[in-house]
Amino acid sequence: MRSDRIKKGFERAPHRSLLRATGLNDGDFEKPFIGIANSHIDIIPGHYYLQEYGRIAKDEIRKAGGVPFEFNTIGVDDGIAMGHEGMKYSLPSRELIADSIETVMNAHQLDALVCIPNCDKIVPGMLMGALRVNVPTVFVSGGPMKAGHLHDGTPIDLNTAFEAVGKRAQGQLTDAELYEIECQACPSGGSCSGMFTANSMNVLCEAMGVALPGNGTVLALTPEREALVRRAARRAVEIAADERFKLRNIANRDAIHNAMVVDMAMGGSSNTVLHMLAISREAGAPLSLRDIEEIAGKVAHIAKIAPSLATVHMEDIHRAGGVPAVLREAARRGGSVREGALTVTGETVGERIRDARTADPELIRPLENAYSPVGGLAVLFGNLAAEGAVVKTAGIQPSMRRFTGAAICFDSQDEAIAGIMGGKVKPGHFVVIRYEGPKGGPGMQEMLSPTSLIMGMGLGESVALVTDGRFSGATRGACVGHVSPEAAEGGVIGLVQDGDRITIDVEARALTVDVPDAELARRREGFRPKRRDPGSSWLRRYAHLVTNAANGAVLRSTDL
């Protein structure tokens, strides 16, 4: 066992002495040492109860013949960090989480790992760190929260609350109506109830085979979720000494392909593209945006979940058959799903989905009745995004799939929010928010506040938005993000001027600004990208090391 390096031989007597101080005895030194990476944190609704799941996992590991060692990571709630300078820390937290997993696991030479994440950057951060460690690993998330409901039974979620702010600003909601939404949108613990970033990533873990069936859709704080935690912990002990289940053997190229298939079939958050680019690099099977676009062209969009379809939430998809049913339906298009991929249970993906059935063909549609013959995410290219940009096509109104508008430019999210609230943004505008990329922000803030204001103020079918920042999984509308190169590295988005005509064409996979090359070259003369001092040594280091969104916003490992 790997842990023999800290517990076997006379020269390890000091190490064993320290371990005995934690309660270990002679018999424990013959057992596998299992790490539990828990992301319990009180301020996040999807994480405040994970301490109990950690306790359950430790109990099950002991019963199964292992020795558990729990440790914690940090976590950032993107919803609470939204719309102020706190959002600059969200994406960078992914790197801290990955580094902390690598540090604890390798410093103590633990044999296997159980990861208990749930929300936003915590899932990809744990995956990235666990892939570096490359021991047998099982993921089990905290699970999605229930959908909220208004007094008349209308289902709502966190996105409803964000869009309600725009409606209140327009006088379309009373304070009492806004208060009801505030109090009912998030009715329980768990990751926010739609196909937002957290649930998208937990679904992708299941599709990759690094988590057990049900990981993406079983509700939080239910007996079914607790049973999933117990099974995951026992499985970690069972596979601790089996090299077949080292994480890179499970999360390989085929598994990453299957994750993107489910992402396209379910119209996941655009953040998944950013994270899967980074995860694939740690797995040694790097994806490119071109690869992702190729997968999107071969996978039908068969399930719509909030925010794309406001009445459907994760609990509904679970009742309809969950991720196995989505994979089984997607597999009917020959070659779409890599069915031979091994999962952490020891089954192949094909074996896992063989008996899956769709209980509601309106929630998980057959290929013949798909929402679209291609995936719910798209990668766009053009003179405004030479290295690529990403749009969640599942959330775009049909009338906005091809749109040309006059640019109205803002050099920060705060400027954009003030401009939208102040009435500067009119029908026919193409809002440009720049200097919000990984380097320029720094931190690549999510633009949920401005996009929700646009929707809430009734501009969703007459205004588009483009940014080198990113979006919450709750964003919907004609919103293009991840523009690369970003403004801070001299991208064309930094050269756009008010009034320039910008076109998004989803079918053509194009994002262009109607400015001649000669004029762009003239504007570039003397152009100096703006530089912001974030006032933080960590964010300064991050801005110096981070790559752009087309590269997954990973940190360079050289040029320190």
Swiss-Prot record:
Q: Which GO terms describe its cellular component?
A: cytosol
Q: Is the Amino-acid biosynthesis keyword given for this protein? A: yes
Active-site residues from the entry: S472
SUPFAM superfamilies named in the record: IlvD/EDD N-terminal domain-like, LeuD/IlvD-like
* Coiled coil region boundaries: none
What does this protein need as cofactor? [2Fe-2S] cluster; Mg(2+)
Catalyzed reactions: (2R)-2,3-dihydroxy-3-methylbutanoate = 3-methyl-2-oxobutanoate + H2O; (2R,3R)-2,3-dihydroxy-3-methylpentanoate = (S)-3-methyl-2-oxopentanoate + H2O
* Pathway involvement of the protein, from the record: Amino-acid biosynthesis; L-isoleucine biosynthesis; L-isoleucine from 2-oxobutanoate: step 3/4; Amino-acid biosynthesis; L-valine biosynthesis; L-valine from pyruvate: step 3/4
**EC number(s) on file:** 4.2.1.9
- Give the family this protein belongs to, as stated in its UniProt record: Belongs to the IlvD/Edd family.
Entry protein name? Dihydroxy-acid dehydratase
Q: Which organism is it from?
A: Anaeromyxobacter sp. (strain K)
The gene name reads ilvD
